[in-house]
Amino acid sequence: MDLIYIPEDLSSCPKFGNKSCPPTNRSFRVRLIMYLLMTGAMVITIFGNLVIIISISHFKQLHSPTNFLILSMATTDFLLGFVIMPYSMVRSVESCWYFGDSFCKFHASFDMMLSLTSIFHLCSIAIDRFYAVCAPLHYTTTMTASMIKRLLFFCWAAPALFSFGLVLSEANVSGMQSYEILIACFNFCALTFNKFWGTILFTTCFFTPGSIMVGIYGKIFIVSRRHARALGNMPENTKGAGRNLSKKKDRKAAKTLGIVMGVFLACWLPCFLAVLIDPYLDYSTPIIVLDLLVWLGYFNSTCNPLIHGFFYPWFRKALEHIVSGKIFRSNSDTANLFPEAH
């Protein structure tokens, strides 16, 4: 999601003629390093999420309510890496927008939509995990196929309507005279918000889903620890392999959820705080800081497949099938990705 820095000195702005690029003092070496780092993040985002998309779509063993939510989120993160990040990279490195005003509005709208869609998916997955861990007896009757479809529809439709409606109507920049002058002067493309819409965006699109996620994952963590302690206190002669496996899974679930929550907050909290606070500081935050915050938010989509790779054995097994070409064999869709279950 884009942010903007509005410079105070617009005296050099041409009143007539072609728009120019904002001045930049970055050396070739600095730009090269930036391109390499951002390209690396893009490649991981695209191919990491593509592995998740192929795996869950192909292997029947992965067809579950939770994984369909993960599949949809991976699609969101893949689109962010494939459609949004390349243009954002050029804009961030060159400090200029070369792709026209019309595409600027589409890019800003789609960028905002995908960023919010990814956040809403994380919240939906938290709800799914809450019922699976804290109310397992009600899970199958609550998280039905119909419920998953409704969650997915909301995760995509609400951000799309909000993002495209806000950007195309230009309500987010209403009353911002300095922004209008900047756009008229330079080849510049960034998403910014006035005080009203900055507050609305922070409250509805970050604080609310973030609070829900923190509350849910906190509850899941407590329940998982309680299950682990209960299994640990049982007499040795009543423990079986299944109970030991359950204890291990509970601990792993609590650890994974903590990492997911920590990565989410680390990536998105600074960006949304800038959205909230910068309008009250007369948009004085340096552009290099805002660029860093934008890419930190993008990095959440880069981290999601990495988290799966480290903590979900099925991801590594599916990746092995894809890389080795086993996925092209007949009946490969029925391959067992959970050998420890047998």
From Swiss-Prot:
**Chain ranges on the Cytoplasmic side, renumbered to this chain:** 57-68, 169-172, 224-256, 308-342
Q: What top-level branch of life does the organism fall under?
A: Eukaryota
The GO terms describing molecular function are: trace-amine receptor activity
Which segments does the topology annotation call Extracellular? 1-35, 90-150, 194-198, 278-286
- Compartmental location: Cell membrane
Q: Which SMART domains match?
A: 7TM_GPCR_Srsx (SM01381)
Q: Which GO terms describe its biological process?
A: G protein-coupled receptor signaling pathway; sensory perception of chemical stimulus
Q: List the disulfide bonds.
A: 21-185, 104-189
TM segment ranges: 36-56, 69-89, 151-168, 173-193, 199-223, 257-277, 287-307
Could you say which protein family the record assigns here? Belongs to the G-protein coupled receptor 1 family.
Report what the protein is called. Trace amine-associated receptor 3
